[in-house]
Amino acid sequence: MVPQGCSLVWVSALYVSVIASLHIINNENSVFIATHSETELRHWLIFVKMAQRNGTAWWRMASVPINAYFERDIAFLFNPRCVIETAMGSKILCRYNKNIGVVFVDNDTKCNVSFPSGVQLQLLNQSVMESIRTKTYVVDYARKTTERGDCFISVAFCRKERRRFLSRCERFVYYCISVYLFAVVVLCSCWFALDPLFNMWA
């Protein structure tokens, strides 16, 4: 017969092990596991140039926390579509040039995009893209007149956070460990629960 105190300690230890393993898998602050290869989640910090609508206003830099991720479908299989999502849930289509680390916002019909803090993301054209100096992160700006009025053109520079994505093999190992620990916990719990009955039958 297994001592009741010992069985309780073993069950508690196994449950703690399972919780710890699941925490490693699911906690974004420790290790992030990509659940599929078609969509890659990234956290970015976007630096946006802002200005008032009059031409004499000073330009200033502001940081806006956002999420940016890449969508792949049939049309964008080899050219992933970048989507910027703000804290308020608004989404902006963009293009991402990984060589210089800049997000380019596609602007077909919209001129201004509102952020939660009231900041407006400045839009980009080809001439501005060619004026980027990536080493010092100095960006130039231009102004473009559209049918909707003045629209400021500028660059949103993104800095990607360093986050480690586990390989398929590592994910498989973590899942196997978790399933094994969970199975051990269930079996031990059943054994300890049925142990008094076995002793009675014996």
Swiss-Prot record:
Instruction: Enumerate the UniProt keywords alphabetically.
Output: Glycoprotein, Membrane, Signal, Transmembrane, Transmembrane helix
Leader sequence residues:
1-20
Q: Name one GO cellular component term.
A: membrane
Q: Which residues cross the membrane?
A: 172-192
Tell me which residues are glycosylated. Answer: N54, N107, N112, N125
Q: Which coarse location class applies to the principal site listed for this UniProt protein?
A: membrane
Which gene codes for it? U22
Cellular compartment(s): Membrane
Q: Answer whether the UniProt record assigns the keyword Lyase to this protein.
A: no
Membrane topology (UniProt): Single-pass membrane protein
| Protein name stated in the entry | Glycoprotein U22
